[in-house]
From Swiss-Prot:
It comes from Salmonella paratyphi A (strain ATCC 9150 / SARB42). One of its GO terms (biological process) is mRNA pseudouridine synthesis. SUPFAM superfamilies: Pseudouridine synthase, PUA domain-like. The active site is at residue 48. This is tRNA pseudouridine synthase B.
Length: 314
Protein backbone atom coordinates (compact mmCIF):
# COMPACT_ATOMS: atom_id res chain seq x y z
CA UNK A 1 0.00 0.00 0.00
CA UNK A 2 1.46 3.36 -1.04
CA UNK A 3 2.12 5.96 1.61
CA UNK A 4 -0.05 9.10 1.53
CA UNK A 5 1.56 11.99 -0.26
CA UNK A 6 2.95 14.58 2.12
CA UNK A 7 1.22 17.93 1.80
CA UNK A 8 3.41 20.95 1.15
CA UNK A 9 2.95 24.52 2.29
CA UNK A 10 0.48 27.00 0.86
CA UNK A 11 3.17 29.61 0.24
CA UNK A 12 2.55 32.31 -2.37
CA UNK A 13 5.00 34.68 -4.03
CA UNK A 14 7.81 35.03 -6.57
CA UNK A 15 11.44 34.14 -5.90
CA UNK A 16 14.02 35.86 -8.12
CA UNK A 17 16.51 33.05 -8.46
CA UNK A 18 19.99 33.64 -9.84
CA UNK A 19 20.14 30.46 -11.91
CA UNK A 20 23.53 28.70 -11.87
CA UNK A 21 25.28 27.52 -15.01
CA UNK A 22 25.00 23.87 -16.00
CA UNK A 23 21.53 23.19 -14.58
CA UNK A 24 18.24 23.14 -16.44
CA UNK A 25 15.52 25.58 -15.43
CA UNK A 26 13.33 22.67 -14.36
CA UNK A 27 16.07 21.23 -12.15
CA UNK A 28 16.46 24.48 -10.20
CA UNK A 29 12.67 24.87 -10.07
CA UNK A 30 12.33 21.50 -8.34
CA UNK A 31 15.11 22.36 -5.88
CA UNK A 32 13.42 25.65 -4.94
CA UNK A 33 10.08 23.88 -4.59
CA UNK A 34 11.63 21.39 -2.15
CA UNK A 35 13.49 24.07 -0.20
CA UNK A 36 10.26 26.02 0.31
CA UNK A 37 8.20 22.82 0.71
CA UNK A 38 5.71 24.48 -1.65
CA UNK A 39 2.58 22.84 -3.00
CA UNK A 40 2.99 24.40 -6.41
CA UNK A 41 5.80 26.03 -8.33
CA UNK A 42 6.51 27.14 -11.88
CA UNK A 43 9.08 29.26 -13.70
CA UNK A 44 8.45 32.04 -16.18
CA UNK A 45 10.48 31.40 -19.30
CA UNK A 46 13.25 28.80 -19.30
CA UNK A 47 16.94 29.57 -19.46
CA UNK A 48 19.30 27.20 -21.28
CA UNK A 49 21.59 25.10 -19.04
CA UNK A 50 24.55 27.21 -20.22
CA UNK A 51 22.81 30.44 -19.13
CA UNK A 52 22.80 32.12 -15.73
CA UNK A 53 20.81 34.96 -14.22
CA UNK A 54 17.32 36.00 -13.29
CA UNK A 55 14.76 33.19 -13.31
CA UNK A 56 11.53 34.22 -11.55
CA UNK A 57 10.01 31.20 -9.82
CA UNK A 58 6.34 31.48 -8.89
CA UNK A 59 5.07 29.65 -5.83
CA UNK A 60 1.47 28.78 -4.97
CA UNK A 61 -1.17 31.21 -6.22
CA UNK A 62 1.52 33.28 -7.97
CA UNK A 63 1.66 30.54 -10.64
CA UNK A 64 -1.73 31.78 -11.88
CA UNK A 65 -0.16 35.08 -12.88
CA UNK A 66 3.16 33.85 -14.30
CA UNK A 67 1.86 34.26 -17.86
CA UNK A 68 2.23 38.03 -17.54
CA UNK A 69 5.98 37.64 -17.03
CA UNK A 70 6.25 35.50 -20.16
CA UNK A 71 5.07 38.57 -22.07
CA UNK A 72 7.59 40.93 -20.46
CA UNK A 73 10.81 42.44 -21.77
CA UNK A 74 14.17 40.95 -20.80
CA UNK A 75 17.79 42.08 -20.83
CA UNK A 76 20.83 39.85 -21.44
CA UNK A 77 24.62 40.01 -21.50
CA UNK A 78 26.10 37.63 -24.08
CA UNK A 79 29.59 36.64 -25.21
CA UNK A 80 29.95 35.04 -28.64
CA UNK A 81 32.81 32.96 -30.02
CA UNK A 82 33.45 34.13 -33.57
CA UNK A 83 34.69 31.85 -36.34
CA UNK A 84 32.80 28.75 -35.21
CA UNK A 85 29.21 27.73 -35.82
CA UNK A 86 27.60 24.95 -33.74
CA UNK A 87 24.45 22.90 -34.28
CA UNK A 88 22.84 24.35 -31.14
CA UNK A 89 24.21 27.90 -31.61
CA UNK A 90 25.94 27.65 -28.22
CA UNK A 91 28.99 26.02 -26.65
CA UNK A 92 27.02 22.92 -25.63
CA UNK A 93 26.65 21.89 -29.28
CA UNK A 94 28.94 20.33 -31.88
CA UNK A 95 31.05 22.54 -34.13
CA UNK A 96 29.67 22.22 -37.66
CA UNK A 97 31.69 24.91 -39.45
CA UNK A 98 34.86 26.97 -38.93
CA UNK A 99 35.74 30.11 -40.89
CA UNK A 100 38.25 32.95 -40.52
CA UNK A 101 37.19 36.19 -38.82
CA UNK A 102 37.92 38.97 -41.31
CA UNK A 103 35.24 41.65 -40.88
CA UNK A 104 36.04 45.29 -40.15
CA UNK A 105 34.71 47.49 -37.33
CA UNK A 106 32.48 49.24 -39.87
CA UNK A 107 31.06 45.93 -41.10
CA UNK A 108 30.34 44.87 -37.51
CA UNK A 109 28.53 48.13 -36.75
CA UNK A 110 26.49 47.79 -39.94
CA UNK A 111 25.58 44.18 -39.16
CA UNK A 112 24.52 45.01 -35.59
CA UNK A 113 22.22 47.75 -36.85
CA UNK A 114 20.16 45.19 -38.81
CA UNK A 115 19.20 43.47 -35.54
CA UNK A 116 17.80 46.59 -33.86
CA UNK A 117 14.11 47.47 -33.77
CA UNK A 118 11.24 45.36 -35.09
CA UNK A 119 12.64 42.31 -36.87
CA UNK A 120 11.65 38.73 -37.67
CA UNK A 121 13.45 35.71 -36.26
CA UNK A 122 13.32 32.06 -37.29
CA UNK A 123 13.62 30.04 -34.04
CA UNK A 124 16.42 27.53 -33.62
CA UNK A 125 15.68 23.84 -34.04
CA UNK A 126 17.08 23.53 -30.51
CA UNK A 127 14.15 25.27 -28.83
CA UNK A 128 11.07 24.21 -26.85
CA UNK A 129 8.64 25.48 -29.47
CA UNK A 130 6.36 22.77 -30.79
CA UNK A 131 5.70 21.42 -34.28
CA UNK A 132 2.78 19.00 -34.63
CA UNK A 133 2.69 18.54 -30.85
CA UNK A 134 6.38 17.73 -30.48
CA UNK A 135 9.16 20.03 -29.24
CA UNK A 136 11.61 21.21 -31.88
CA UNK A 137 14.67 20.02 -29.96
CA UNK A 138 13.25 16.48 -29.99
CA UNK A 139 13.28 16.54 -33.80
CA UNK A 140 16.76 18.11 -33.79
CA UNK A 141 18.18 15.34 -31.61
CA UNK A 142 16.92 12.84 -34.20
CA UNK A 143 18.62 14.78 -37.00
CA UNK A 144 15.28 15.97 -38.40
CA UNK A 145 14.75 19.59 -39.47
CA UNK A 146 11.17 20.81 -39.68
CA UNK A 147 9.79 24.05 -41.15
CA UNK A 148 9.60 27.02 -38.76
CA UNK A 149 7.86 30.29 -39.40
CA UNK A 150 9.62 33.58 -38.75
CA UNK A 151 8.24 35.33 -35.67
CA UNK A 152 8.12 39.07 -35.02
CA UNK A 153 10.32 40.28 -32.15
CA UNK A 154 11.60 43.66 -31.01
CA UNK A 155 15.19 44.43 -30.03
CA UNK A 156 14.85 47.66 -28.08
CA UNK A 157 18.57 48.01 -27.50
CA UNK A 158 21.63 46.18 -28.80
CA UNK A 159 24.76 47.52 -27.14
CA UNK A 160 28.27 46.78 -28.36
CA UNK A 161 30.47 46.09 -25.31
CA UNK A 162 33.74 44.79 -26.74
CA UNK A 163 35.41 42.85 -29.56
CA UNK A 164 38.70 41.18 -28.69
CA UNK A 165 40.15 38.56 -31.03
CA UNK A 166 37.49 35.91 -31.57
CA UNK A 167 35.23 37.17 -28.77
CA UNK A 168 32.33 39.58 -29.12
CA UNK A 169 30.36 40.86 -26.12
CA UNK A 170 26.93 42.47 -26.41
CA UNK A 171 24.02 43.55 -24.21
CA UNK A 172 20.51 42.94 -25.52
CA UNK A 173 17.19 44.40 -24.35
CA UNK A 174 14.44 42.52 -26.16
CA UNK A 175 10.79 41.53 -26.28
CA UNK A 176 9.25 38.19 -25.39
CA UNK A 177 10.03 35.27 -27.66
CA UNK A 178 13.54 36.44 -28.55
CA UNK A 179 16.22 33.75 -28.83
CA UNK A 180 19.65 35.23 -28.08
CA UNK A 181 21.35 32.13 -29.52
CA UNK A 182 19.57 32.77 -32.81
CA UNK A 183 20.61 36.44 -32.86
CA UNK A 184 24.24 35.38 -32.42
CA UNK A 185 23.99 32.64 -35.05
CA UNK A 186 22.34 35.01 -37.54
CA UNK A 187 24.90 37.72 -36.77
CA UNK A 188 27.74 35.28 -37.37
CA UNK A 189 26.31 34.41 -40.78
CA UNK A 190 25.88 38.08 -41.66
CA UNK A 191 29.53 38.68 -40.75
CA UNK A 192 30.57 35.66 -42.84
CA UNK A 193 32.48 33.89 -40.08
CA UNK A 194 29.88 32.06 -38.01
CA UNK A 195 29.41 32.46 -34.26
CA UNK A 196 27.99 30.75 -31.20
CA UNK A 197 27.16 31.69 -27.61
CA UNK A 198 29.76 30.87 -24.95
CA UNK A 199 28.30 32.96 -22.11
CA UNK A 200 24.75 34.14 -21.52
CA UNK A 201 23.36 35.92 -18.48
CA UNK A 202 19.82 37.22 -18.07
CA UNK A 203 20.22 40.52 -16.28
CA UNK A 204 16.61 41.54 -15.78
CA UNK A 205 13.02 40.40 -16.32
CA UNK A 206 10.34 43.09 -16.50
CA UNK A 207 10.98 45.67 -13.74
CA UNK A 208 12.20 43.26 -11.07
CA UNK A 209 15.08 44.68 -8.98
CA UNK A 210 18.41 42.97 -9.59
CA UNK A 211 19.37 43.25 -5.92
CA UNK A 212 16.52 40.90 -4.93
CA UNK A 213 18.08 37.94 -6.77
CA UNK A 214 19.23 35.04 -4.59
CA UNK A 215 21.29 31.95 -5.32
CA UNK A 216 20.51 28.32 -4.56
CA UNK A 217 23.54 28.27 -2.28
CA UNK A 218 22.13 31.16 -0.24
CA UNK A 219 18.79 29.40 0.16
CA UNK A 220 20.50 26.19 1.26
CA UNK A 221 22.65 28.12 3.74
CA UNK A 222 19.57 29.75 5.27
CA UNK A 223 17.91 26.34 5.69
CA UNK A 224 21.02 24.93 7.40
CA UNK A 225 21.36 27.96 9.71
CA UNK A 226 17.68 27.85 10.63
CA UNK A 227 18.04 24.17 11.54
CA UNK A 228 21.09 24.89 13.70
CA UNK A 229 19.24 27.65 15.56
CA UNK A 230 16.05 25.64 15.94
CA UNK A 231 13.80 28.05 14.05
CA UNK A 232 11.51 27.31 11.08
CA UNK A 233 13.35 27.83 7.78
CA UNK A 234 10.27 29.63 6.47
CA UNK A 235 11.01 32.44 8.91
CA UNK A 236 14.05 33.38 6.81
CA UNK A 237 13.00 32.08 3.40
CA UNK A 238 9.57 33.69 3.03
CA UNK A 239 10.75 37.33 3.30
CA UNK A 240 12.79 36.75 0.12
CA UNK A 241 9.61 36.41 -1.95
CA UNK A 242 8.18 39.18 -4.12
CA UNK A 243 4.38 39.70 -3.92
CA UNK A 244 2.20 37.21 -5.79
CA UNK A 245 0.81 39.97 -8.03
CA UNK A 246 4.27 41.26 -9.02
CA UNK A 247 4.19 39.40 -12.38
CA UNK A 248 1.31 41.72 -13.34
CA UNK A 249 2.86 44.91 -11.98
CA UNK A 250 2.61 46.65 -15.37
CA UNK A 251 -1.20 46.62 -15.24
CA UNK A 252 -3.28 49.37 -13.58
CA UNK A 253 -4.88 48.74 -10.19
CA UNK A 254 -8.60 48.88 -9.45
CA UNK A 255 -9.57 48.87 -5.77
CA UNK A 256 -12.99 47.49 -4.83
CA UNK A 257 -14.82 48.14 -1.58
CA UNK A 258 -15.56 45.00 0.40
CA UNK A 259 -19.24 45.31 -0.48
CA UNK A 260 -18.34 44.86 -4.19
CA UNK A 261 -15.36 42.53 -3.94
CA UNK A 262 -17.49 39.71 -2.53
CA UNK A 263 -19.43 39.62 -5.82
CA UNK A 264 -16.24 39.85 -7.88
CA UNK A 265 -14.71 36.90 -5.99
CA UNK A 266 -17.86 34.89 -6.72
CA UNK A 267 -17.29 35.34 -10.45
CA UNK A 268 -19.52 38.35 -11.13
CA UNK A 269 -18.59 41.58 -12.96
CA UNK A 270 -18.96 44.66 -10.79
CA UNK A 271 -19.17 48.39 -11.37
CA UNK A 272 -16.60 50.71 -9.86
CA UNK A 273 -15.23 54.22 -10.22
CA UNK A 274 -11.81 55.18 -11.50
CA UNK A 275 -11.34 52.14 -13.74
CA UNK A 276 -9.69 52.44 -17.19
CA UNK A 277 -11.90 52.25 -20.27
CA UNK A 278 -10.62 48.83 -21.35
CA UNK A 279 -8.00 46.16 -20.78
CA UNK A 280 -6.71 44.01 -17.96
CA UNK A 281 -6.42 45.33 -14.40
CA UNK A 282 -5.07 44.17 -11.07
CA UNK A 283 -7.91 44.05 -8.58
CA UNK A 284 -7.50 44.75 -4.87
CA UNK A 285 -10.03 45.03 -2.08
CA UNK A 286 -10.54 47.11 1.02
CA UNK A 287 -8.44 49.77 2.66
CA UNK A 288 -5.38 47.50 2.84
CA UNK A 289 -5.41 46.94 -0.97
CA UNK A 290 -5.32 43.16 -0.69
CA UNK A 291 -4.75 41.58 -4.12
CA UNK A 292 -7.64 39.31 -5.12
CA UNK A 293 -7.02 38.64 -8.81
CA UNK A 294 -6.95 39.93 -12.37
CA UNK A 295 -9.96 41.48 -14.02
CA UNK A 296 -10.86 42.91 -17.40
CA UNK A 297 -13.05 45.88 -18.24
CA UNK A 298 -16.07 44.58 -20.19
CA UNK A 299 -18.21 46.36 -22.79
CA UNK A 300 -20.39 47.88 -20.06
CA UNK A 301 -17.42 49.33 -18.17
CA UNK A 302 -17.61 46.75 -15.39
CA UNK A 303 -14.66 44.86 -13.92
CA UNK A 304 -15.09 41.19 -14.87
CA UNK A 305 -13.00 38.52 -13.08
CA UNK A 306 -10.38 36.70 -15.18
CA UNK A 307 -8.01 35.03 -12.67
CA UNK A 308 -8.90 34.88 -8.98
CA UNK A 309 -6.76 34.22 -5.93
CA UNK A 310 -7.91 31.26 -3.87
CA UNK A 311 -7.95 32.22 -0.20
CA UNK A 312 -6.29 29.54 1.91
CA UNK A 313 -6.82 29.23 5.66
CA UNK A 314 -3.97 30.66 7.68
Amino acid sequence: MSRPRRRGRDIHGVLLLDKPQGMSSNDVLQKVKRIYNANRAGHTGALDPLATGMLPICLGEATKFSQYLLDSDKRYRVIARLGQRTDTSDADGQIVQERPVTFSAEQLASALETFRGDIEQIPSMYSALKYQGKKLYEYARQGIEVPREARPITVYELLFIRHEGNELELEVHCSKGTYIRTIIDDLGEKLGCGAHVTYLRRLTVSKYPVDRMVTLEHLQTLVAQAEQQGVPAAQWLDPLLMPMDSPASDYPVVNLPLTSSVYFKNGNPVRTTGAPLKGLVRVTEGEDDKFIGMGEIDDEGRVAPRRLVVEYPA
